[in-house]
Regions:
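Residue-level signal for inorganic ion chemistry
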Residues: 17, 21, 52, 84, ...
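Acidic beta-strand-loop-alpha-helix segment within the catalytic core
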Residues: 99-186, 192, 237-270
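Oxyanion/phosphate-interacting regions
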Residues: 1-12, 18, 167-169, 186-270
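Generic detector of well-ordered alpha-helical packing
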Residues: 42, 64, 80-83, 87, ...
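Substrate-binding/gating loop at the entrance of the active-site cleft, primarily
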Residues: 83-98, 104, 115
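Short glycine-aspartate micro-motif
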Residues: 75-77, 86, 109, 196
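N-terminal subdomain of lithium-sensitive/metallo-dependent phosphomonoesterases centered on the IMPase/IPPase/PAP
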Residues: 1-81, 265-270
Length: 270
């Protein structure tokens, strides 16, 4: 069993590392980097890796610093700055994502978005907890957002230029663009919406933390074929994931019936 309370130490570490995102956004001339790589991403992951090894020394898979795998039952899975392309364009809403797998099962997740229009937001959970905690407070996710009707579906920032088309696909919910898939999933787990969607391939480091949070509230993540997404003991997907739909099961099942491929001809990224 995972040691009680380590999620609080992880959250403190993630918030500390997330301060680098804000500092980078405020640099004269904007963030350093191009395309899908920001220089600060590596700096953040180095801080996270060092701190996580002190909290629980085990295997590690990071987007920037690579893999350290020995066959340990636990494995940290880290994305230091999910939503880098939007971050480099000066848009807020990227997130630090730290998940922990126990023999391929998500058992801890911390997602921290330091610079959203709503302010900083940290959502976390670990196995054995009865509820999520958000910004230091225990929360009971709202049941009213578990269905699509009257709720929102979190989609990529590319949807901002095609709101009407996305709203049709999300109906009877409406769409809300967010750069980070990790943060989309975390907000769904916290009760802010019914589902989070990515129409482009994701990696385990993008979604393990959010998957843990969804698991805590009875949700799940499905691939483009409607199969529940699962991981190997080496922190890889069992099947290739081209798209993902995360949230309450019935909401995801409904969204999976929609013609999302039509958007790929309209949007540069999702």
């Amino acid at each position: 069993m995972l040691q009680t309370g380590i999620v609080y130490r992880v959250a403190d570490l993630v918030i500390e590392a997330g301060a680098l995102i804000l500092a980078e956004l405020r640099r004269p001339g904007g963030p350093r980097g191009s395309g899908y790589k920001a220089e600060v991403d590596l700096e953040i992951e180095v801080v996270l890796r060092r701190g996580l090894e002190q909290i629980l020394s085990c295997d590690f898979v990071g987007e920037e610093t690579g893999r350290h795998q020995t066959g340990h039952r636990y494995c940290w899975v880290v994305d230091p700055n999910d939503g880098t392309a939007d971050f480099l364009a000066g848009r807020s809403g990227s997130a630090v994502s730290v998940g922990l797998l126990d023999e391929g099962e998500p058992v801890l997740g911390v997602v921290y978005a330091p610079g959203t229009p709503r302010g900083s937001d940290c959502i976390a959970w670990q196995q054995g907890m009865n509820a999520l905690f958000r910004n230091g407070r225990v929360i009971a996710p709202s049941k009213q957002n578990r269905d699509l009707k009257g709720s929102v579906v979190f989609v990529s920032s590319a949807a901002a230029s095609k709101r009407a088309e996305n709203d049709i696909l999300c109906a009877p919910a409406t769409c809300e663009p967010i750069p980070s898939i990790a943060y989309r999933l975390a907000r769904v787990a916290a009760g802010d919406g019914a589902a989070g969607v990515s129409l482009y391939p994701v990696s385990p480091h993008d979604i393990v933390a959010g998957h843990a949070l969804l698991k805590a509230v009875g949700g799940d993540i499905f691939d483009q074929d409607g199969k529940p997404i699962r991981y190997t003991v080496s922190a890889e997907f069992i099947y290739p994931v081209e798209q993902c739909f995360g949230g309450q099961v019935e909401a995801c099942r409904t969204l999976l019936t929609r013609q999302w491929l039509t958007l790929l001809k309209l949007e540069p990224g999702a």
